[in-house]
Amino acid sequence: MKFTFLKLTMMAFITVGAFSCKNTEKEAETPVEEASEATEMATEYTVDTDASTIMWEGAKPTGKHHGTIKLSSGTVHLNNGNVEAGEFVIDMNSITDEDLEGDDKAKLEAHLKGTVEGKEGDFFNVKEYPTAKFEMTGIENNVVKGNLTIKDKTN
């Protein structure tokens, strides 16, 4: 089963990343909610990370880019066909761009990963923060809500 909420998660993920570039203004405080807990009746499923890909899109005034990122691990808890809880660990080193080629592709990926010397903090700084995490806090009207942790900051 493919989860639509992974697309929603990535949109939130890219939004957080897009605004993390050297912003000196005070960061907005977003309340962190308790992660959903599965009931005793729920069945835990492990995400097939080889078959799972998160698609991302990032935009700026001069254009946009899109690509993929992989999961390191993940679990989903179902009870009578309904998702009750879930947690996903995202492999930040796996972020790739799919709309550029050659040097431009390599430069953008290095910029996003934070592997450019002197610009490690611009986006994801994968050397210091190799993973991100999404924990579900609930589902309302088929929209998954959750806490996204990137670079040890949870929103």
Each language-model region and where it sits:
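C-terminal motif of bacterial Sec signal peptides marking the signal peptidase cleavage site
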Residues: 17-20
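Hydrophobic helical h-region of N-terminal Sec-dependent signal peptides
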Residues: 10-15
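Low-complexity, acidic/polar, glycine-enriched regions of mature
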Residues: 22-155
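Bacterial N-terminal signal peptides that target proteins for export
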Residues: 1-9
